[in-house]
Amino acid sequence: MASFLSFLLGEKKKTASVAKERLQIILAHERNGRNASEPDYLPALQRELVAVISKYVKISPEDLKVQLERQDNLEVLEVKIELPDTVR
């Protein structure tokens, strides 16, 4: 009888398990929606590198490229900086 009532009324899930399931779904959607080859931190890293390098050499944001490449089971962070001919 109890199983019949739970079938009709539905078993109440614990709040924590419901929240966990929802979070897993949200994370899965976010991972699928973004470019897997470019982590979220790359644009911020590029801006910070430009700011630091600009203290010593005059460069623009276009002079610096940051890219993350996956090779087999390794991740390689590649930073290319086009330096001017003369230093300040």
From Swiss-Prot:
SUPFAM superfamilies, alphabetized: Cell division protein MinE topological specificity domain
Keyword Cell cycle appears in the UniProt entry: yes
Gene Ontology biological-process entries: cell division; regulation of division septum assembly
Record flagged with keyword rRNA-binding: no
Pfam families recorded: MinE (PF03776)
Family: Belongs to the MinE family.
Family matches, as NCBIfam families: minE, PRK00296.1, PRK13989.1
Protein name: Cell division topological specificity factor
